[in-house]
Structure formats: structure tokens, C-alpha cells
């Protein structure tokens, strides 16, 4: 059962990062990649865990540099790291601050649970709520890097 929870957590984490990446970069991702990417990432983690761990941070930067060869490199780094950092920060904020305020506590942080998957699935809607309430426009960032 723990392996199923672990695989679902990986899938939900990569799904959320892909959705965040698509939202801020305005680069459409084909629906097939939402299925293939988590599978390939889990396969990479099984074959060589250190490479899989570091590939998680560099894959979006490399993808942006490939897609936008003649654009700003700093903007490519921003688009590559933003989804990963926001996923981590909002997940921690939900898990350690928001849910305990609502009376939901994690008693054993060392083991994975359905609670972790719920946190991952709530990161993207929470991000959308923050972006819409603050009226952030990521297209203005492109103009700042010109």
C-alpha cells in the first residue's frame, strides 16, 4: 500500500509542477505528456536515483532553453525553477501552517499518507487563488527581461 501512495505522490507532484509550468510560461503541454512524464521520472529514479533527483531541477530549464533559444537566459531559468519552488513552498505552507490552523495534524512525518497527496493536489488551486487575488500577470515579466 505504501508503494501505491508513493507512486501517486510522485505523479501528483509532477502533475502539479507541469500545470504550474504551463500556466506561467504560456507554453502548452500536450495531454499525453501528463501521462508520460511522471512514468519516465519514476523510471529514472528507479534506474539512477541521484540523476533523477537532480534532473527534476534542470529539466524545465533545459526545456525552456531549447524552446526559446534566442530569448533571455535569466527568464528561462525563472520559468524553469518557479514551478518547483512554488510547489515546495505552497506544499509546506499548507502542511505546516494552514492545515494545523484548521485542526488537521500530521502525527508521523516520516511515513507517507493520503494527507501528502491531498496537499499536493491542493497546491495548484491554492496557487491560482493567490495569482487571481493578487492579479499577477506573468506576461509582464517577459517585458521586463527585454
Predicted stretch roles:
Residues 2-146:
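Hydrophobic alpha-helices of bacterial signal-transduction systems
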Amino acid at each position: 500500500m505504501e508503494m501505491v501512495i508513493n507512486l501517486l505522490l510522485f505523479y501528483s507532484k509532477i502533475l502539479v509542477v507541469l500545470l504550474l509550468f504551463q500556466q506561467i510560461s504560456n507554453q502548452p503541454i500536450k495531454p499525453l505528456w501528463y501521462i508520460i512524464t511522471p512514468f519516465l521520472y519514476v523510471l529514472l529514479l528507479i534506474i539512477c536515483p541521484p540523476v533523477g533527483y537532480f534532473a527534476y531541477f534542470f529539466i524545465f530549464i533545459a526545456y525552456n532553453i531549447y524552446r526559446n533559444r534566442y530569448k533571455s537566459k535569466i527568464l528561462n531559468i525563472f520559468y524553469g525553477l518557479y514551478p518547483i519552488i512554488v510547489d515546495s513552498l505552497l506544499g509546506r505552507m499548507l502542511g505546516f501552517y494552514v492545515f494545523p490552523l484548521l485542526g488537521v495534524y500530521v502525527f508521523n512525518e516520516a511515513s507517507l499518507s493520503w494527507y501528502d497527496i491531498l496537499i499536493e493536489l491542493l497546491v495548484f488551486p491554492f496557487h491560482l487563488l493567490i495569482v487571481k487575488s493578487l492579479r499577477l500577470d506573468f506576461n509582464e515579466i517577459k517585458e521586463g527581461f527585454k
